[in-house]
Design a protein with these regions (language model features):
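ABC ATPase NBD Q-loop/coupling interface
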Residues: 14, 63-80
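Interfacial catalytic loop of ABC nucleotide-binding domains
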Residues: 76, 100, 121, 138-140
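Conserved ABC ATPase "signature" region
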Residues: 117-135
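Short helical segment in ABC ATPase nucleotide-binding domains corresponding to the A-loop/adjacent helical element
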Residues: 93, 102-110, 120, 124
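Conserved ABC ATPase signature
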Residues: 140-144, 148
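Conserved structural motif at the start of ABC-family nucleotide-binding domains
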Residues: 3, 21-23
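The feature captures the beta-strand-to-loop junction immediately N-terminal to the Walker
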Residues: 39-41
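Helix-to-loop junction immediately C-terminal to a conserved catalytic motif
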Residues: 54
């Protein structure tokens, strides 16, 4: 699987007084089997660039190609792109946003279009693997300890 960014530009709040260019004409190619490191100062655009790789956000201009195909050409194919390109955040415990532990873990499978039964099976299995039992399912994710959140 190769990923290409061609002249990628991303502008936040474009056309407003808060306009901020986060990425400016970035061109990059990642070949199949290649590993890269992305480093930079706070606010340099690292997270913005990463969010483009699986279509979480769309560029202001330029294109993202997955195996030569523009990922934004057909919005219906974004689900498949996201199955192929996953993101792992540095501090995943800061990415919690659902009201319950169960719903937070179910977010991914739900957005992949799994059935309710498959979602339940995946959530229970995932939580069991990391040692979080059913007594936590209906609690807020923010009631978990730091270690539990990371798991």
């Amino acid at each position: 699987m190769s990923i290409q960014l061609n002249h990628l530009t991303h502008v936040y709040n474009e056309g407003t007084t808060f306009e901020k260019v986060a990425l400016n004409d970035v061109t990059l190619e990642i070949q199949t089997g290649e590993f890269i490191g992305l480093i930079g100062h706070t606010g340099s655009g690292k997270s913005t660039l990463i969010q483009h790789l699986n279509g979480i956000i769309s560029p202001s201009s330029g294109e993202i190609l997955l195996d030569g195909e523009n990922i934004h050409k057909d919005k219906a194919k974004l689900k498949e792109v996201r199955r192929r390109i996953g993101l792992a955040f540095q501090y995943p415990e800061y990415q919690l946003f659902e009201m319950t532990v169960y719903k937070d873990v179910a977010f991914g499978p739900t957005n992949l279009g799994l059935s309710a039964e498959q979602i339940h099976e995946n959530v229970v299995a995932a939580l069991n693997i990391v040692g979080i039992d059913e007594t936590f399912y209906e609690k807020s994710p923010f009631e978990l300890s730091g270690g539990q959140k990371r798991r």
